Regions:
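N-terminal secretory targeting modules
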Residues: 1-154, 159-186, 203-208, 236, ...
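Alpha-helical cap/lid subdomain in secreted, periplasmic
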Residues: 144-145, 170, 191-211, 220, ...
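Residue-level recognition of beta-strand->loop/alpha-helix junctions
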Residues: 214-216
Length: 275
């Protein structure tokens, strides 16, 4: 059991991250877990260097952890993540309702996170992903037969691996469309999700040689994806493409977003119909 354990299955949760933060009234928010723990196995700092103790650093209240008065668990103060809005267009999309402040994207927010590992008896009653591999018969057949398998990731900064603590990705510059290296190395040293998926596929299909290509670009929108799919993705000779756009297109109407995703798929399949 580890980082790829399915959170919607079983009764074990590994290192669920939570963050305590200060709200506008000075109250401490956070501490909510996905499930109500039966047994908490560990509560640690983001780098596992500090082990927090129940009763000393926190208490349990149903599915929440509550900080004690003298807890060692860090609190993200409001002045760190909430800044005065000065009219800079790049921050307008995260402006708060009062119009005077905006939410800062704190690149090292992980320093305020704690990791909770626990067991539970709760049944997952929300959305559960299902196996849809039957919709990709050519890709699945290729994986099962073995040989070189070209896996391409195409999306925004999350797919590129930005802020993953163990990121080591070759991604794309959104403006120049040139390759560049994204590297981060700090605890807990977790690879970008594209690397995790690639490694998992390689483990599951050892007869195949998974060749990963990351064509994602930080800051890119789904419309950028439409404009550059032919140049960036098609030359990779993909057997499977995983799209990861959306974070920078949150203001797009659903219809336009869906049409853009379909356009990317059509562009790729026009040259690679078996993908």
């Amino acid at each position: 059991m580890g980082i790829l354990t399915r959170i919607w299955e079983g009764n074990f949760v590994y290192q669920e991250p939570i963050c305590f933060s200060e709200d506008a009234e000075g109250h401490i928010a956070g501490g909510q877990l996905l499930y109500q723990p039966e047994h908490i196995l560990s509560v640690t700092s983001f780098d596992s260097s500090v082990f927090y103790e129940e009763g000393t650093d926190y208490i349990r209240e149903d599915s929440r952890l509550i900080l004690t008065e003298h807890s060692r668990i860090p609190i993200l103060s409001r002045d760190i993540y909430c800044k005065p809005f000065t009219g800079v267009p790049e921050t307008a999309w995260v402006r708060l309702p009062d119009g005077k402040h905006y939410m800062e994207v704190v690149s090292d927010v992980y320093r305020w996170q704690i990791l909770v590992t626990y067991t539970h008896k709760t049944v997952w009653d929300s959305f559960s992903p299902v196996d849809s591999s039957s919709l990709l018969p050519q890709s699945m057949q290729k994986l099962q037969n073995g040989g070189d398998f070209h896996l391409v990731f195409y999306g925004d900064s999350i797919t590129a691996g930005w802020e993953a603590s163990g990121c080591n990705e070759s991604a794309i510059d959104m403006v120049t469309l040139e390759d560049y290296h994204v590297t981060l190395w700090h605890a807990p040293y977790q690879p970008a999700w594209a690397e995790l998926v690639s490694n998992s596929l390689q483990h599951r299909y050892p007869q195949s040689n998974i060749i990963k290509k990351n064509r994602a670009a930080g800051g890119s929108t789904v419309q950028w994806g439409v404009e550059n799919a032919k140049e960036l993705v098609c030359p990779c000779n993909p057997n499977l493409v995983i799209l990861g756009f959306g974070m920078n297109s949150m203001q797009e109407p659903a219809k336009i977003y869906k049409a853009a995703i379909l356009s990317i798929i059509q562009t790729i399949r026009s040259e690679h119909p078996d993908c």
